Amino acid sequence: MLGCGIPALGLLLLLQGSADGNGIQGFFYPWSCEGDIWDRESCGGQAAIDSPNLCLRLRCCYRNGVCYHQRPDENVRRKHMWALVWTCSGLLLLSCSICLFWWAKRRDVLHMPGFLAGPCDMSKSVSLLSKHRGTKKTPSTGSVPVALSKESRDVEGGTEGEGTEEGEETEGEEEED
């Protein structure tokens, strides 16, 4: 797991660092042109002051006709450190939880709760799209088939004498010899 996380973090740092041209050092020690320009050291001498392009090529800052050195930006550095801490913590938590579940499954400690373990019975659920909406469908008298077998007549509540065939005895009848 960490084998995937470390290259991903490295790629993130590389992409972020390539934006300002400082590489990975720009992530840990970002430079900025923000702040008061008068208390900074001049950069490039008179030629850089006369040519703003030369000033910027020297990776200096140019504002109001003054070419000056960049300063480390502590606010951006703090934000980068927090991003790095949260990313590493998330990767560590993910790795540990995967290892914990793998260990628990190998030791057969991980069990599904009882209400989730059984098969899914969809007959009790009500579908909003179904036409019947959970009502029990009972056959009407017109839709009952005419020829029913003996078992189905007994189940449907037929009387005791109705289901007998010729040659069978019922409890209340006696055979005449």
Curated annotation (Swiss-Prot):
Membrane topology listed for this record: Single-pass type I membrane protein
Gene Ontology MF terms: identical protein binding
Membrane side Extracellular: residue ranges: 22-81
Disulphide-bridged cysteine pairs: C33-C61, C43-C60, C55-C67
GO biological process: hematopoietic progenitor cell differentiation
Cytoplasmic side: 103-177
SUPFAM superfamilies: Trefoil (SSF57492)
GO cellular component: inner acrosomal membrane; nucleus
Region (Disordered): 131-177
Cell compartments where the protein resides: Membrane
Pfam families per the UniProt record, alphabetical: TMEM190 (PF15431)
Transmembrane segments: 82-102
The entry's keywords: Disulfide bond, Membrane, Signal, Transmembrane, Transmembrane helix
Domain P-type: 31-71
Signal peptide: 1-21
Biased composition (Acidic residues): 157-177
KW Transmembrane helix (keyword) present: yes
Major site of localization recorded for this protein: membrane
Taxonomic superkingdom: Eukaryota
UniProt name for this protein: Transmembrane protein 190
Provenance organism: Homo sapiens (Human)
